[in-house]
UniProtKB/Swiss-Prot annotation:
GO terms for molecular function: iron ion binding; isopenicillin-N synthase activity; L-ascorbic acid binding. Its cofactor is Fe cation; L-ascorbate. GO terms for biological process: antibiotic biosynthetic process. The gene is pcbC. SUPFAM superfamilies: Clavaminate synthase-like. Residues 183-283 form the Fe2OG dioxygenase domain. This is Isopenicillin N synthase. Signal peptide: none annotated. The lineage of its organism: Bacteria, Pseudomonadati, Bacteroidota, Flavobacteriia, Flavobacteriales. Pathway: Antibiotic biosynthesis; penicillin G biosynthesis; penicillin G from L-alpha-aminoadipate and L-cysteine and L-valine: step 2/3. Fe(2+) binds at H209, D211, H265. N-[(5S)-5-amino-5-carboxypentanoyl]-L-cysteinyl-D-valine binds at R84, Y88, Y186, H209, D211, S276. 2-oxoglutarate binds at R274. It comes from Flavobacterium sp. (strain SC 12,154). Belongs to the iron/ascorbate-dependent oxidoreductase family. Coiled coil: none annotated.
Length: 326
């Protein structure tokens, strides 16, 4: 029988209220979770996840091979100039999962960062509206909703780190966030591509990695698949399709000098139709938070200050080099 990691369910609704004692209690629970397994579930978030699952399932099933190719990012379709926004193809005999990634809806042709040609900034392309009515509207609204959830959770992190609850707000804005949503589909296949094995012999759909983000806010189908590395080895992460699964990314680890590490995790092989929809909460290109450690935690030395744009660009490239194109 597989062992489960300790992944608490935390009611985050109090972080939107005015009772500081309640906020401090929630922050303390976030602190324990992130210093423990590295994961927690955010409950009472106010997002209709059942609607998200149905809309995304229906959309994936309606996409044609031709549409996927037309939207495929440059790694798959050299004619497409986009590196982040677009379709990430399944590759027969090599890779089963497929996904569509979209970025900040605020990025349009007149946005200052788009005009400047900054890396990691792209104007979203979408499937044809006539074939997929309401898709763009639905997912732009979801981006706003899950951004707000992440902003609330970051209040808890700020309090847990001994800062004002608004600490992250000036760096995390809908106007210029580099955040992204990925609509990942893992299909059921009669002939699944060859699998990679973990060092413990576990069959894997995606190898061990850390998230390139400040934090990650994930919705997933209630089918067990994720494992987190602990001192006891890899442990299963309990599943829920009612709550968001939250973990720190490597930028949070960097700015806290390792106080909140980015948990190493992996995806087990499960041959079942399911969804994984991460929101990678990213700051703006120019944001740069000076690393610090909450008292009394004070490791020797300290990390250098790194702008978020540089961090994200290099972090994503390193992830692709280590694990291959997603």
């Amino acid at each position: 029988m597989n062992r489960h990691a300790d992944v608490p369910v935390i009611d985050i609704s109090g972080l939107s209220g005015n009772d500081m004692d309640v906020k401090k209690d929630i922050a303390a629970r976030i602190d324990r979770a992130c210093r423990g397994s590295g994961f927690f579930y955010a409950a009472n978030h106010g997002v209709d996840l059942a609607a998200l699952q149905k809309f995304t399932t229906d959309w994936h099933m309606a996409m044609s091979a031709e549409e996927k190719w037309e939207l495929a990012i440059r790694a798959y379709n050299p004619a497409n100039p986009r590196n982040r926004n677009g379709y990430y193809m399944a590759v027969e005999g090599k890779k089963a999962n497929e996904s569509f990634c979209y970025l900040n809806p605020s990025f349009d042709a007149d946005h200052a960062t788009i005009k400047a040609g900054l890396p990691s900034h792209e104007v979203n392309i979408w499937p044809d509206e006539a074939r997929h009515p309401g898709m763009r509207r639905f997912y732009e609204a979801y981006f706003s909703d899950v951004f707000d959830v992440a902003a609330v959770i970051l209040r808890g992190f700020a309090i847990a780190l001994g800062r004002e609850e608004s600490f992250f707000e000036r760096h995390f804005s809908m106007d210029d966030t580099l955040s992204a949503v990925s609509l990942i589909r893992y299909p059921f296949l009669e002939n699944y591509p060859p699998l990679k094995l973990g060092p413990d012999g576990e069959k894997l759909s995606f190898e061990h990695h850390q998230d390139v983000s400040l934090i990650t806010v994930l919705y997933q189908t209630a089918i067990p698949n994720l494992q987190v590395e602990t001192a006891e080895g890899y442990l299963d992460i309990p599943v829920s399709d009612e709550h968001f699964l939250v973990n720190c990314g490597t930028y949070m680890a960097h700015i806290t000098n390792g106080y909140y590490p980015a948990p190493v995790h992996r995806v087990k092989y499960i041959n079942a139709e399911r969804l994984s929809i991460p929101f990678f909460a990213n700051l703006s290109h120019a944001s740069a938070i000076d690393p610090f450690a909450p008292p009394p935690y004070a490791p020797p030395g300290g990390n250098p200050t790194v702008s978020y744009g540089d961090y994200l660009q290099h972090g994503l490239l390193d992830l692709i080099r280590a694990n291959g194109q997603t």
